[in-house]
Amino acid sequence: MVTVLRLSSLCRANRASAFKSLLIRPVPCLSQDLHTVQTSQIHTSQNHHAASKAASLHWTSERALSVALLGLLPAAYLYPGAAVDYSLAAALTLHGHWGLGQVVTDYVHGDAKIKLANTSLFALSALTFAGLCYFNYHDVGICKAVAMLWSL
C-alpha cells in the first residue's frame, strides 16, 4: 500500500515523467479516494496479540528432535546400552507421532473423523512406546536387535 500511496502522490503532483520508467507502472486503484486507500491496509507482520507461541515452539522442538536423532543413531551403534535404547524408544515414538500427526492434520477432514484419528494416533503412539520399552526390558534392546539384523 505504500507503493500505491507514493504513486498517487506522484499523480497529484503532476510528475508524469516518473511513469516513463519501465519499473514504475500505473496502479488501477489510483482512481480511488485517498482516504479509502489509506484505510484499507494489508499487514504482513505477525500478530502481536497472539495467544501463545505454541506452534513456533512445536516446530522448534520437532527440529531439535530430528537433530538429536542424527546424533543418537551413531551413539546407538558405538555405545549400545539401556540408556540409548530407551532414548531411541522415546525419540522414535515422538518423531513418528509428530509426523503422523501432520498427516492427520493435512488429510483428515470432518470433526468426528479428526477426533477419531487423533485418538487412534495417541493410542498407536502409546502402544508403540510401551512395546519398545517392553522389548528393551525383556529382550535384547533396540541397539542389539539392529546389530543382530545387520550381522545376518
Swiss-Prot record:
Residue ranges, Mitochondrial intermembrane side: 79-83, 136-152
Residues at which heme b binds: H95
Binding positions (a ubiquinone): Y107
Gene Ontology BP, a term: mitochondrial electron transport, succinate to ubiquinone
Compartments where found: Mitochondrion inner membrane
Pfam name, any one: CybS
UniProt keyword list: Electron transport, Heme, Iron, Membrane, Metal-binding, Mitochondrion, Mitochondrion inner membrane, Transit peptide, Transmembrane, Transmembrane helix, Transport, Tricarboxylic acid cycle
Main localization (coarse): mitochondrion
Mitochondrial matrix side: 22-56, 105-113
Function: Membrane-anchoring subunit of succinate dehydrogenase (SDH) that is involved in complex II of the mitochondrial electron transport chain and is responsible for transferring electrons from succinate to ubiquinone (coenzyme Q). SDH also oxidizes malate to the non-canonical enol form of oxaloacetate, enol-oxaloacetate. Enol-oxaloacetate, which is a potent inhibitor of the succinate dehydrogenase activity, is further isomerized into keto-oxaloacetate.
Oligomeric and partner information: Component of complex II composed of four subunits: the flavoprotein (FP) SDHA, iron-sulfur protein (IP) SDHB, and a cytochrome b560 composed of SDHC and SDHD.
Similarity comment text for this entry: Belongs to the CybS family.
Protein name: Succinate dehydrogenase [ubiquinone] cytochrome b small subunit A, mitochondrial
Organism: Xenopus laevis (African clawed frog)
